[in-house]
């Protein structure tokens, strides 16, 4: 098994606390409204804290698919949220687990900087596929931008 680590940042015009609330605390309701491909989010196991497993149902290429998302840690005080993809279409056959350590910090002009560390644990001697990595980054960037756009269009959301 190999572990490969990547880091990325995204900027937003939305304040960190408001963005965190939408991405973490109210995610089950906000994300399906903001991200066209995601149809629903349901808790499969747990109470919303660490260890909780959520099923995200999405439409991709005209097909209904799902991703299993396990919450690893929630740090409201520091606007941190760690989770892993543990099953479904988000997990290629060569990958054991993909973990995300995320944190929001103050950005310019009252906005945010979203920082993420991605750890890919492969099965056996498998190497991460560069194209899969680029596609995953593009999906992550689009997801972050969709939430930002939703919040910009809904200033009443606090």
Curated annotation (Swiss-Prot):
InterPro entries recorded: Bet_v_I/MLP, Bet_v_I_allergen, Plant_def-hormone_signal, START-like_dom_sf
Where is it mainly found?
cytoplasm
Where trans-zeatin 2 is bound, by residue?
A: 60
| Positions annotated to bind trans-zeatin 3 | 69, 81
Please state the Enzyme Commission number of this protein: 3.1.27.-
EC class name = hydrolase
The answer, when asked if Metal-binding is one of the entry's keywords, is: yes
Q: Which residues bind Ca(2+)?
A: 32, 35, 38
Respond yes or no to whether keyword Nuclease is given for this record: yes
GO biological process: any one?
abscisic acid-activated signaling pathway
Please give an example of a GO cellular component term from this record: nucleus
The entry's localization annotation reads:
Cytoplasm, Cytosol
Q: Which UniProt keywords apply?
A: Allergen, Calcium, Cytoplasm, Hydrolase, Metal-binding, Nuclease, Pathogenesis-related protein, Plant defense
Output the Gene3D superfamilies linked to this UniProt entry. 3.30.530.20
Check the record and name the Pfam families matching this protein: Bet_v_1
Molecular function GO labels: abscisic acid binding; calcium ion binding; cytokinin binding; melatonin binding; protein phosphatase inhibitor activity; RNA nuclease activity; signaling receptor activity
Superkingdom classification of source: Eukaryota
Q: What protein family is recorded?
A: Belongs to the BetVI family.
- Which PANTHER family does the entry mention? OS08G0374000 PROTEIN-RELATED (PTHR31213), STRESS-INDUCED PROTEIN SAM22 (PTHR31213:SF55)
Protein role: Class II ribonuclease (RNase). Binds to cytokinins. Interacts with melatonin.
Q: What's this protein's name?
A: Class 10 plant pathogenesis-related protein 2D
> Which organism does this record belong to?
Lupinus luteus (European yellow lupine)
């Amino acid at each position: 098994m190999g572990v490969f680590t990547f880091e990325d940042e995204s900027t937003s015009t939305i304040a960190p606390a408001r963005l965190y609330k939408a991405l973490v605390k109210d995610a089950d309701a906000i994300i399906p409204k903001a991200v066209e491909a995601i149809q629903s989010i349901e808790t499969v196991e747990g109470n919303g804290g660490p260890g909780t497993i959520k099923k995200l149902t999405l439409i991709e290429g005209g097909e209904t698919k799902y991703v299993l998302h396990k919450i690893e840690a929630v740090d409201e005080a520091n606007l941190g949220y760690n989770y892993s993809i543990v099953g479904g279409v988000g997990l290629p056959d060569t990958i054991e687990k993909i973990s995300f350590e995320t944190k929001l910090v103050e950005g310019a002009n009252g906005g945010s900087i979203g920082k993420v560390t991605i750890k890919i644990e492969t099965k056996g001697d498998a190497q991460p596929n560069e194209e899969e990595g680029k596609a995953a980054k593009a999906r992550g960037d689009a997801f972050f931008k969709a939430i930002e756009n939703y919040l910009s269009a809904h200033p009443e959301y606090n």
